[in-house]
């Protein structure tokens, strides 16, 4: 972290992207600015965002590979230049982009002699490869080579104990960290009592999402983390009665719509987050797991889409409908919702 004195002016708190570039298919860079901040606030925001970006962003990667009857990961397979361990390490480096949840199956099935790259992986429709040229193995002889793969979306670094799997299935230490590095610097501006701080935030990603997308997701995760503190505890209500209850923010969905109507503006559905809906914790968590963050995301889903969400029930569907019906114009619901 670097501190410098620079000239600046006091204005409403705002952020913007001051630099964005693509260094390669697996290296994106973005530089953002947030200002003006009071003294000490830049450190608070910078530390929180850096931790959230490095540890809370979800990524998709290959977590398991099955070769068939292979006694151990240091084995070699006739007609293949690389050992099983080297192939596993190459699979670990494959960068995937998806919105899937749970475990999905993929496979590789080719005939040599030829080079195997990430382009040869047969993936589910919801998954795509960031860099199709990433190497996997080199077949030096005319052999049939097949691998069954498992793909999972998670966060952080996951390890599994190594065993001699009789069926030839081997775990891959999953690195579900789309953000490769984060750095922030703080610049001071102004004089005397008018001194403010400017926060510069640099983000590098692996190409599975852009730095702007990573910043958005990290910010949403931090907001979700602090939501319980935004609502004052109801007087006379015991902890036991509230411990399983989702607490909405102070600025509720209803209040947001009322303000918009007073200002005679259209309703920006992509700016209303599901955090502001009066949803139960169960329904809210189901939607978040399905990457439904805004009202626009929700209204773009059909009933079939919602019912395919893990743990989503008919009661959740009815609860969502009742909430929207209470606050949204009925013609908007008919146009947007198919259930």
Swiss-Prot record:
Region (Alpha N-terminal domain (alpha-NTD)): 1-233
Keywords from the named record: Chloroplast, DNA-directed RNA polymerase, Nucleotidyltransferase, Plastid, Transcription, Transferase
EC number annotated for this UniProt entry: 2.7.7.6
Entries under SMART domains matching the protein: RPOLD
Biological processes per GO annotation: DNA-templated transcription
Region (Alpha C-terminal domain (alpha-CTD)): 266-339
Gene Ontology CC, one term: mitochondrion
Group of enzyme by EC: transferase
Keyword Transmembrane helix carried by entry: no
Reaction catalysis annotation: RNA(n) + a ribonucleoside 5'-triphosphate = RNA(n+1) + diphosphate
Listed GO MF terms: DNA binding; DNA-directed RNA polymerase activity; protein dimerization activity
Keyword match Cell membrane: no
Subcellular location(s) of the protein: Plastid, Chloroplast
Cited InterPro entries: DNA-dir_RNA_pol_insert, DNA-dir_RNA_pol_RpoA/D/Rpb3, DNA-dir_RpoA, RBP11-like, RNAP_asu_C, RNApol_insert_sf
SUPFAM superfamilies per the UniProt record, alphabetical: C-terminal domain of RNA polymerase alpha subunit (SSF47789), Insert subdomain of RNA polymerase alpha subunit (SSF56553), RBP11-like subunits of RNA polymerase (SSF55257)
Job description of the protein: DNA-dependent RNA polymerase catalyzes the transcription of DNA into RNA using the four ribonucleoside triphosphates as substrates.
HAMAP family: RNApol_bact_RpoA
Domain notes: The N-terminal domain is essential for RNAP assembly and basal transcription, whereas the C-terminal domain is involved in interaction with transcriptional regulators and with upstream promoter elements.
Subunit structure: In plastids the minimal PEP RNA polymerase catalytic core is composed of four subunits: alpha, beta, beta', and beta''. When a (nuclear-encoded) sigma factor is associated with the core the holoenzyme is formed, which can initiate transcription.
Family of this protein: Belongs to the RNA polymerase alpha chain family.
Protein name: DNA-directed RNA polymerase subunit alpha
Species, as recorded: Psathyrostachys juncea (Russian wildrye)
């Amino acid at each position: 972290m670097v501190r410098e004195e620079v000239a600046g002016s006091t204005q409403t708190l705002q952020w913007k992207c001051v630099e964005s570039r693509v260094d390669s298919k697996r290296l994106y860079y973005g530089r953002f600015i947030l200002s003006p901040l009071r003294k000490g606030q830049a450190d608070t925001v910078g530390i929180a965002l850096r931790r959230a970006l490095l540890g809370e962003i979800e990524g998709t990667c290959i977590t398991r590979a099955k070769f068939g009857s292979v006694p151990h990961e240091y084995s070699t397979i006739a007609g293949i230049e690389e050992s099983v361990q080297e192939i596993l390490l190459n699979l670990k480096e494959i960068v995937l982009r998806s919105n899937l949840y749970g475990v999905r199956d993929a496979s590789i099935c080719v005939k040599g002699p030829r080079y195997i790259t990430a382009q040869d992986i047969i993936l589910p429709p919801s998954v795509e490869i960031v860099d199709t040229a990433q190497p996997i193995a080199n077949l030096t002889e005319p052999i049939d080579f097949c691998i069954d793969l498992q793909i999972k979306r998670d966060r952080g670094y996951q390890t599994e104990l190594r065993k001699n799997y009789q069926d030839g299935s081997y775990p891959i230490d999953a690195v579900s960290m789309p953000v490769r590095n984060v750095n922030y610097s703080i610049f001071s501006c102004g004089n005397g009592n008018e001194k403010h701080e400017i926060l510069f935030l640099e983000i590098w990603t692996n190409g599975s999402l852009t730095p702007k997308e990573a910043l958005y997701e990290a910010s949403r995760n931090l907001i979700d983390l602090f939501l319980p503190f935004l609502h004052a505890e109801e007087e006379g209500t015991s902890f036991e009665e509230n411990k399983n209850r989702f607490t909405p923010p102070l600025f509720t969905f209803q209040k947001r719509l009322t303000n918009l109507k007073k200002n005679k503006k259209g309703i920006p559905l992509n700016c209303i987050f599901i955090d502001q809906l009066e949803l139960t914790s169960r329904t809210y968590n189901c939607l978040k797991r399905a990457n439904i963050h805004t009202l626009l995301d929700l209204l773009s889903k059909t009933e079939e889409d919602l019912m395919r969400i893990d743990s989503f029930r008919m009661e959740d569907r009815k609860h969502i409908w009742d909430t929207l019906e209470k606050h949204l114009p009925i013609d908007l619901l008919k146009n947007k919702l198919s259930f």
